[in-house]
């Protein structure tokens, strides 16, 4: 009798524990992507890493040694920080302060790379697997570009994304995912230890060689339309070269 009762309790609570495990994994992970672009200029591959740790998310671009991070202060405030990994330096922004010409308000875009709003505009075409391993394929036609997203909802993670048009194809591939909490905390701790400067104070300090060089090269420029595009390419003075 006791064995039967225990079995029933285990059966009732197992799905809840399973769901909690999925959620815990989604909140602390590192996902690594390759981004392959093919167009008239040829083929190019870049790398992108997505790091999450309980309300903080970072995009690391190995090719430029830049890490962009965002902290969810509350439901409506997001605090951005840009880390220059090669120099162990950081530029901090206040919540609500404009970065790339606008204030950060869309947490799902930063946390997932593909926002809830974008996914909501796409059509589900197939679904495979179950539980944490469920994969959903979404598609959308957008001004001559066909978008295909393979989505893992339990982890809020893209496993594949393709944007194809007559002029260009871009393909994102998830190469690996890790859930090593110690590794993740070390990644963020290393960057928290960088020498940090508030963005509002950059123009007041003319003695810092790093800041002077970055401003001169256009890596840090107030009112620029952006410093790095979504692939992590440096933008000189707000314009792509």
Predicted features along the sequence, with ranges:
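Sec-dependent N-terminal signal peptides
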Residues: 4-13
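N-terminal leader/targeting segments and the immediate start of mature chains
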Residues: 16-55, 193-229, 238-241
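An acidic-aromatic
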Residues: 44-114, 170
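Gly/Pro-enriched, hydrophobic low-complexity segments
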Residues: 58-65, 79-83, 129-195
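Surface-exposed, polar helix/loop patches in the mature regions of secreted/periplasmic/lumenal proteins
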Residues: 87-149
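Short, surface-exposed secondary-structure junctions/capping segments
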Residues: 106-115, 183-204
């Amino acid at each position: 009798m006791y064995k039967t009762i225990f079995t029933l309790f285990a059966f009732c609570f197992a799905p809840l524990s399973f769901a909690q495990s999925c959620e815990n994994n989604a909140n602390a992970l590192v996902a690594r992507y390759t981004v392959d672009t093919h167009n008239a200029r040829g083929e190019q591959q870049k790398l992108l890493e997505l790091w999450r740790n309980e309300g903080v998310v970072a995009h690391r671009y190995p090719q430029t040694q830049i890490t962009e991070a965002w902290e969810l202060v509350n439901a409506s405030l997001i605090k951005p920080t840009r880390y220059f990994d090669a120099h162990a330096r950081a530029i901090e922004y206040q919540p609500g302060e404009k970065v790339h010409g606008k204030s950060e308000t869309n947490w799902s875009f930063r946390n997932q790379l593909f926002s809830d709003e974008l996914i909501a505009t796409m059509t589900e075409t197939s679904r495979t697997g179950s539980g944490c391993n469920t994969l959903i394929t979404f598609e959308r036609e957008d001004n001559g570009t066909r978008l295909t997203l393979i989505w893992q909802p339990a982890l809020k993670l893209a496993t594949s994304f393709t944007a194809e048009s007559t002029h260009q194809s871009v393909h994102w591939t998830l190469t690996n995912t890790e859930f090593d909490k110690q590794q993740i905390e070390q990644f963020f701790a290393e960057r928290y230890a960088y020498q940090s400067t508030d963005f509002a104070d950059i123009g007041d300090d003319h003695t810092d060689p790093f800041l002077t060089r970055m401003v001169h090269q256009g890596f840090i420029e107030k009112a620029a339309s952006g410093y790095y595009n979504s692939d992590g390419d440096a933008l000189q003075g707000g314009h792509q070269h």
